[in-house]
Amino acid sequence: MNVALVAHDSKKTLMENLCIAYRHILLKHSIFATGTTGRVIEDSTGLTVEKYLEGRLGGEQQLAIQIAHNDIDVVIFLCDPEFEYVGEPGIAGILRLCDTHNVPLASNLATAEALLLALDRGDLNWREILR
């Protein structure tokens, strides 16, 4: 499955720790991430990550396009609720696309862990049928 990982700057360490803890699950899937987040994940876990541009430079738009084309199966977007990009898709745009295309999305650690465990159990295999 294709898993997208995005984290605002204040959440990058949290994303790094999540990926270290669940490396054994992520290893079985294709990982996509915005530029800086992807580099952090690669450096700390050794996982192969297909990196978009940095979020502010268009990486979130690249992710949005892949969601719209139903090429992403799970999104984990650890966002800083106090941070807002004006004129960028950000979490609101990504959430809207995920809702439109039935892509599971986690925006906090608790939901991210639940999605990763569901992914490992095969609970999200129905996504394969959609592609």
What does each model-found stretch correspond to?
Residues 60-100:
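Mid-chain, well-packed structural core segment of small domains
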Residues 28-37:
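Short internal beta-strands
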